[in-house]
From Swiss-Prot:
Official protein name in the record: Glutaminase
Binding positions (substrate): 63, 113, 157, 164, 188, 240, 258
Catalytic activity, EC: 3.5.1.2
UniProt cross-references to HAMAP family, sorted A to Z: Glutaminase
Catalytic activity: L-glutamine + H2O = L-glutamate + NH4(+)
GO biological process, one term: glutamine catabolic process
Keyword annotations: Hydrolase
Family note: Belongs to the glutaminase family.
Length: 304
């Protein structure tokens, strides 16, 4: 497969669409990123790297961090994790509180904010600094020791985290928080503020294409069954309440973030990451979704 030429074709075709949408502005630091930025990378299961545009520019991974936080929590608890967070699509916005009342403080899945807060609570219970543990995990997955979180973005998020605090306190009232809500929200905002590039995120997700083993180090991250299950959750819940449309158009398990990144995996073949910060109405990168749709169209590769 000539991924290099396909990426260049996607980049050329995408030019009229760059900047379409709106950069996230409820986190002020994110609003400063140029809306027409674009990068895309593919890392194959054999370790080959293909890139186009600003594929080596680091950006705020935001909700993509939920995938890797969930991986760590799954390592720690196994299936016991699902006693505290569900595995169903929510059908509501990623920061909605609506279902928490009727479902007694158990979030629908680990990729909406409420579910990610429960996952972060698990990590805070296990690690002195959950966000540091996640940063170290990302460094191990990629071999890049300079990966870290952006303290300015973390502070910006903390100043505007009222809804996340409300969710954490609400779940605590149902007994689904073991650590103080403020500690959990602080760690959550810092993990969302991790900065990585398209190449680095594709490398990090590669274990999902390789039966749970990170090709960079040979480390087993998850057993084969757990890697399959985590990929299934990405497919059904990874792109907010647009997951059905995303699967229809793209046909790959993926996790998106309001920083404009989307990471996607094709088991046994490759991991891809695209970044373009202008978002559609669901909080997914508008150009990013289109780029991944064209990737599976031009290559003829998807899980279906």
């Amino acid at each position: 497969m000539n991924y290099a030429s396909i990426l260049e074709q996607i980049r050329g075709d995408l030019q009229p669409f760059l900047g379409t949408g709106k950069v996230a502005d409820y986190i002020p630091e994110l609003a400063t990123v140029p809306a027409d930025s674009f990068g895309m990378a593919i890392v194959t299961a054999s370790g080959e790297i293909f890139r186009t545009g600003e594929a080596d520019t680091r950006f705020s991974i935001q909700s993509i961090s939920k995938l890797f936080a969930c991986t760590l929590a799954f390592q720690l608890l196994g299936d016991a994790l699902w006693e505290r967070v569900g595995r169903e699509p929510s059908g509501t916005a990623f920061n909605s509180l609506v279902q928490l009342e009727s479902e007694r403080g158990k979030p629908r899945n680990p990729f909406i904010n409420a579910g990610a807060l429960v996952v972060t609570d698990v990590l805070c219970r296990r690690f002195v600094q959950a966000e540091t543990a996640l940063v170290e995990f990302m460094r191990r997955l990629t071999g890049e020791t300079s990966i870290d979180y952006d303290s300015r973005i973390a502070q910006s998020e903390l100043q505007h985290a009222h809804r996340n605090r409300a969710m954490a306190h609400f779940m605590a009232s149902f007994g689904n928080m073991e650590m103080p809500p403020e500690v959990v929200v602080d760690a959550y905002c810092r993990q969302c503020a991790i900065s990585m590039s398209c190449v680095e995120l594709a490398k990090a997700a590669l274990f999902l294409t390789n039966h749970g083993v990170a090709p960079v180090t040979g480390e087993r991250i998850l057993d084969t069954s757990s890697a399959k299950r985590l990929s299934a959750l990405m497919l059904t819940c990874g792109t907010y309440d647009a997951a059905g449309d995303f699967v229809y158009r793209v046909g790959l398990p993926a996790k998106s973030g309001v920083g404009g990144g989307i990471v996607a995996v094709l088991p046994g073949e490759m991991a891809a990451c695209v970044w373009s910060p202008a978002l559609d109405s669901n909080g997914n990168s508008a150009a990013g979704v289109l780029a991944l749709e064209w990737l599976t169209t031009y290559t003829g590769q998807s899980i279906f």
